[in-house]
Amino acid sequence: MKKLTKTHSHRQQKLASIINEALIEILRRGKMLDTRLFDCPLTITKVIVTADLKIANCYFLPFNTKLTIDEIMDALNNSKNAIRNFITNKINMKFSPDIRFYYDHGFDNAIKVAHLLKDL
């Protein structure tokens, strides 16, 4: 019988937690980041690490910013090496995972559902 939900190993969850905390810290400090991120408050909503621990998918949500999602993605990708180096110093592993950033559509989807329910 197949499992309906995908479970993550303890190592995946632990690494995701460490990466999440490191991302929050480096975004708060702002050192070595693209200057466009200085006035762009971001929330890291979740981090999902692949089973082989080589890729960390990081989902973010911006608040009160004049930048577009594409500009924020570009700024995060420009800062990716500095972020990855910072994370490498936080973890004790042979390899540091590749960091990939994605806009979290969860909030937008929740608003759409709320509007649909309101219209019923």
Curated annotation (Swiss-Prot):
Record's GO cellular component terms: cytosol
InterPro entries for the chain: KH_dom-like_a/b (IPR015946), RbfA (IPR000238), RbfA_dom_sf (IPR023799), Ribosome-bd_factorA_CS (IPR020053)
Location within or outside the cell: Cytoplasm
Top-rank taxon, per record: Bacteria
Disulfide bond listed as a keyword: no
Keywords on record: Cytoplasm, Ribosome biogenesis
Listed GO MF terms: ribosomal small subunit binding
GO biological process: maturation of SSU-rRNA
Known role: One of several proteins that assist in the late maturation steps of the functional core of the 30S ribosomal subunit. Associates with free 30S ribosomal subunits (but not with 30S subunits that are part of 70S ribosomes or polysomes). Required for efficient processing of 16S rRNA. May interact with the 5'-terminal helix region of 16S rRNA.
Binding partners and assembly: Monomer. Binds 30S ribosomal subunits, but not 50S ribosomal subunits or 70S ribosomes.
Similarity field: Belongs to the RbfA family.
PANTHER family assigned: RIBOSOME-BINDING FACTOR A, CHLOROPLASTIC-RELATED
Record-given protein name: Ribosome-binding factor A
Organism of origin: Rickettsia africae (strain ESF-5)
